[in-house]
Structure formats: C-alpha cells, structure tokens
C-alpha cells in the first residue's frame, strides 16, 4: 500500500510513529530515511510495488506533518498534507510489539456514528491519500463493516475539541478498543485546492503574526 519514512534526522518518537503506522496500514513498510533523496525514495517505493510514499516531518521532537506522494515512474506528485496537533503512540495506549499486517486486506476508513460533514469529508480525503476504502458508517458496527470488507484493520475518524482524530483498530488484536496510533489533525490540505483548518471551522481568530509564523514553519519543514 505505501512506503513510510521520515524527514532527515528524525527523533525517536517520530520513528516510533512511523513503525506504528506500518503496523496498522496493510502491506506497508517503514524505511529508515538515511541520506536518501525524494527521488530515491520514490524509486524504492516503485520497485517495491507501493502506490504511495508517506514522509513524516518533525517539529520540536514531535511529528508535525504527514506528506503523501503518489508513486509513479512518470507521473509522481504531491497529493496532500496533514498538519498535526500531536499523536499518541501504540505503547502509550497499552500495545507493544504488534506485528505488521502482511496479508492482502483493505484499510477501511469510516467515521464515528455521530459526526459532522467535516469528518465525512476528511474520511474521504484520508482514503484518497492512503488508497484505503471509505465506507460510510451509518448505524453499522465496526465489526459488521470489517466482516463485509474482509479486513482486520479500520481507521475511524472521530470528533476532537482541537480538530479531527484518526483512531486505528486492529480487530485481530482486540475488538474492544483502538490500538493506536491516535492522530490529532488540525489542518489538512490537498493539492487540488481542498483544505480544512480547525481554527477556521471553529471560528477561532489567529493573530496575523502567528498565522505568518505557522505558515513559515510548515514550509521550512518540508519533505526533502
């Protein structure tokens, strides 16, 4: 599904986050970046048969941004970006040493039962970024959705006071609670112009200086 790596000189927490994603995104691989360029990463992803390259960027020791890139020898390109408030690792949720999923199964992306249009829109966006399968929740249980699509792993989009949360479930591990990682998304931006910012959505005013700083911070920590 995707090759997962980081920006240069990642922190231990960022590497752990990458490994956690490898454990909940089927047929994915976490790769230590080293000195590899974007082009070298794309070629490695293509040689391994992946459709996506995910690069995790760091800010003050924590994962700041997730950059998704389409893998194609002649038509590669940036697809979109998730800016994060923070993450909660699997070990912080009580799960250690989970094995990656090497079976051929879809990553099903759905929502909690009572969410707004913003959450539905993001669930569809996240499915595009990951090549996952978006399934509207309705009144269905997670177990019934998983059974219908023959999968053990679901990404559930949920409400959060400071944005949108992605919670991952591994039903082969436990059917009672998510295993993580938990990802708190504050902004998402797609290259085709679609975007969402929790401050704008919640009517929070941002001082001009802070807005300018946040923009530069995101630019300064790009994927290369």
Curated annotation (Swiss-Prot):
NCBIfam families: PRK03972.1
Signal peptide: none
Signal listed as a keyword: no
Entry-linked HAMAP family: BriX
SMART domains: Brix
PROSITE patterns xrefs: BRIX
Protein name per Swiss-Prot or TrEMBL: Probable Brix domain-containing ribosomal biogenesis protein
One Gene Ontology biological process: rRNA processing
Function statement: Probably involved in the biogenesis of the ribosome.
tRNA processing is among the record's keywords: no
Protein's organism: Pyrococcus horikoshii (strain ATCC 700860 / DSM 12428 / JCM 9974 / NBRC 100139 / OT-3)
Keywords linked to the UniProt accession: Ribosome biogenesis
SUPFAM superfamilies according to UniProt: Class II aaRS ABD-related
InterPro entries (UniProt xref): Brix, Brix_dom_Rbsml_bgen_prot
Brix domain sequence ranges: 1-196
Single GO molecular function: rRNA binding
